[in-house]
């Protein structure tokens, strides 16, 4: 179980965890978490992309909501840019065809990753049915690396639906 008193405690707990966001959420809310994709598109990389890929290389852009399997409540909205060519064969297909979150797929495929904070998101999330701009408590952007090679950049918005799981200080 994870104890979080408020949004500042949520940020501190997230920054201090070494596990996946999915594991953290499951401990916080007490239910299994599934990923529901809104977008799953191939895009061309731009210069200075933070992933160390050439301009024009194809990357996977994915937008998804992490939801409670039982409650159906949205807890996190995330946008990811992924270098699929640097991940095991089948990663992109599993991501596209299942509700398994990214972190769990990486664990199942035995891909060890490290998280490197990039900072706050550059802007607001794209409009979607699960979230409005004012509906989040904490936002962050980080890069995942495997064997010191960047494999993806993820921006997450932790939604106000997490507030009922805060414990009294």
Residue ranges, per PLM feature:
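N-terminal domain-onset segments
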Residues: 1-141, 145-169
């Amino acid at each position: 179980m994870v104890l979080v008193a408020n949004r500042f405690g949520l940020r501190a707990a997230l920054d201090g965890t070494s596990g996946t966001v999915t594991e953290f959420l499951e401990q916080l809310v007490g239910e299994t978490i599934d990923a529901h994709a809104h977008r799953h598109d191939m895009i061309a990389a731009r210069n200075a992309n933070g992933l160390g890929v050439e301009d024009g290389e194809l990357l996977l852009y994915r937008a998804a909501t992490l939801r409670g399997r039982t409650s159906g409540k949205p807890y996190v909205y995330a946008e990811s840019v992924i270098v699929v060519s640097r991940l095991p064969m089948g990663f992109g297909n599993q991501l596209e065809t299942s509700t398994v979150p990214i972190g769990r797929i990486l664990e199942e495929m035995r891909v060890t990753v490290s998280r490197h904070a990039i900072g706050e998101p550059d802007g607001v999330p794209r409009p979607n049915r699960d979230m409005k701009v004012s509906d989040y408590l904490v936002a962050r952007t980080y890069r995942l690396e495997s064997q010191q090679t960047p494999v993806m950049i993820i921006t997450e918005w932790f939604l106000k639906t997490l507030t009922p799981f805060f414990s009294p200080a």
